[in-house]
């Protein structure tokens, strides 16, 4: 659950218990955006929830890139990268089907209203390099992946650090190339060289590894 929804008394009570933080969007920062600071390190007055992070049995991050940013800000030794994320078996089977489909020689661009997803820069890149592109959007997960996977390349230039980036991993699982910047955690994982079925199998392994890690920490 999102611990920001907890009351102060509930958070205080948890500090004496055995709990894990599955870190996602830099909740130790007031603005949640480490990109605003040099080397992603915020000044002390920009940190929040520090004691809650300190008292955790473990802070699980989604990539080594993500874990390093958290470590540089909090200087804690209870931080660990799980090196991936979780997809349902149903989603992985769907990605398997989409990986086998023929793809157009064009770029997929996520058409997002969220400013830090930086859709305009991806569009400008495609236009400047004379690449065909398709804007992909929608709330239906399957339909969105079908739009995405119809192309052979994802173009994505986020403005803030992506702890992993599900869209990048999903694109690789569908056998696509990825054009991005240095703000995507997934691209710095050793398994990122994999794509298609090989990467899908790696994420299947994560479905076993991550829960086993959590159970081990809580036992």
Model-derived features: where do they sit?
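Alpha-helix capping/helix-boundary segments
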Residues: 5, 27, 65-67, 185
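A short, active-site helix/loop in glycosyltransferases that binds the activated sugar's phosphate group
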Residues: 54-78, 118
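Short N-terminal targeting/anchoring amphipathic segment
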Residues: 1-11, 18-22, 155-156
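Active-site proximal beta-strand in glycosyltransferases
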Residues: 14-43
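Conserved catalytic-core segment of nucleotide-activated headgroup transferases in glycan assembly
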Residues: 86-144
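Short, conserved loop/helix-junction motifs that constitute active-site signature segments
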Residues: 11-17, 50-55, 101, 170
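Membrane-proximal helix-turn-helix segments that form the acceptor-binding/catalytic region
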Residues: 37-59, 68, 149
